[in-house]
Amino acid sequence: ILTFVFGLEPTSPPIDVMLMIVAVIAAASCMQAAGGLDLMVKWAEKLLRKNPSKITLLSPLVTYIFTFIAGTGHVAYSVLPVIAEVATETKIRPERPLGIAVIASQQAITASPISAATVALLSMLSGHNISLMDILMISVPCTLIGVLVGAFCSLHVGKELAEDPEYLRRVANEEFTSDKYRAKGVENHHAALLSVIIFIAATIGIVLFGS
């Protein structure tokens, strides 16, 4: 509409941002193919199942770290079934940890050094003597503080399950399945671990070179 109706001249395509997205997707795909993402989900599952009472506080930190490392919020999908199941088993409203976990994964996009959002912002500020480290020094603590505040607020969202009539009705009607969700096993643990290490090392390298 702006081009054909109002006659505005289109700008050049954001090649840098597009190449960054391609690079991140390619690297994340390699890590997934090597089993690295499955290994990370396995670690997250162990952490959450060992600390079920702290699920509302830990789940947003887990999804935040996942997205921060990978540069995309899509990697957090794999851990959401674990969060929902652990919360239900602990008689904690699943919407509490799930809601803030999804928000945390999106907040981490603006703090991740390899996300398209951060790269786009860096390209826009390139002429103002602002480095990647300058952006991260603001975005990381701000998003982390916001996520933690949101997690504490989520502790009091909705009724307790023991007082929720809809939950009690579904329990009485045996609508809940007894099957437990388990994260996908890792066939080659060494290769999976190596892929995670390489990916994290590459992320650190981007931060150092971008500074």
Give the location of each predicted region:
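Hydrophobic alpha-helical transmembrane segments
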Residues: 2-8, 79-94, 137-143, 189-195
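Membrane-embedded alpha-helical segments and adjacent helix-loop junctions characteristic
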Residues: 4-90
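Residue-level signature of transmembrane alpha-helical entry/exit and packing/kink sites
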Residues: 16-17, 52-56, 135, 139, ...
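Hydrophobic alpha-helical transmembrane segments of polytopic
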Residues: 55-59, 98, 195-199
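Alpha-helical transmembrane segments and, especially, the helix-loop junctions at the ends
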Residues: 63-80, 93-138, 143-157
